[in-house]
């Protein structure tokens, strides 16, 4: 049985106070529910025991006169005697709401968001972009004076955690002038044009060892065809193996939720790029995904992205949409690996459906993570995506390619 050691920091001063002793509950949600959704700002709600009045904003308690809005928050956990804790969330306080159900009780709930919310509060105004690959365009947006997203330092330290992780793209974006457009809206369009992803990542990619400067909350740009982070984890029935943690529940989807037989993609100023799966259309009808006003320079890149998508999702498949884990019920070694999981991690899941005789194995990518934590319990939910194909069809790796499947789509 794992025994997590928590450190919940709220930056009321230097050093950052640890408020763990007063925490009644934490809810964290990061990433997205499914592969077609845009990545949303991660959120964290921390409920604090405020019986002593310690956290009442503008009150007479210990932190009453402190700044609340905009201060940094970190949710860290140490497992398996690790040298450095794993970050489940790093972000900033948006609201601090006090509740007084009677004369003797009080709670304060801190509502927090991560770096995507920071981008959502800025606007790109009268900016000229050169023709450049997507990753260069992304950096140019972040470095624009009106956005000013924190830079990634060359040598991360405990005081200066790294904030960016940007893949090098080969997909060219057209030169453009952007006038008065929300930064988050523009970056969502950039991610679609890249056929990649932009998200804030918590945890530790691929289950790597946590360094001193790895505090989570890292803004990622994933290029087209980017592989998942290989974790080596296989979720299944009861097991004590460090790389085979048990799950408590598994959800699947099968049907029209991810079923498209036609795609219409178009870059700004370009012609419609239309792909139709003529073999599947007579069976499932015309089901169209439309993406217009993409930022690409070349129609060929747009057509490739459209083809990748249609031929991945033109027939229904049994897909695992999520798995649930109870980290406290795992071994220390298992819990440490599971706690590090975040968006874009690659995992396997094995399960035997009710009434079936043989176990199925699926290769999955993590799309979102939810933590629900109380002093005596911890539930973790992973939102996942995958092709729906069995692992025995895998070509080269469990996260990067499937025999006779187009592996280039998300």
Question: What are the language-model segments listed below?
Answer:
Residues 120, 142-176:
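N-terminal export/assembly leaders
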Residues 70, 151-160, 317-327:
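Short glycine-rich, low-complexity/disordered patches
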Residues 1-23, 130-131, 135-136, 185-365, ...:
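Acidic, small/polar-enriched beta strand-loop surface segments
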Residues 44-48, 104-113, 210, 216-220, ...:
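A generic structural motif
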Residues 77-79, 141-150, 190-194, 347, ...:
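Hydrophobic, Leu/Ile/Phe/Ala-enriched alpha-helical segments that form helix-helix packing faces
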Residues 4, 82-84, 151-164, 229, ...:
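Acidic Ser/Thr/Pro-rich low-complexity disordered segments
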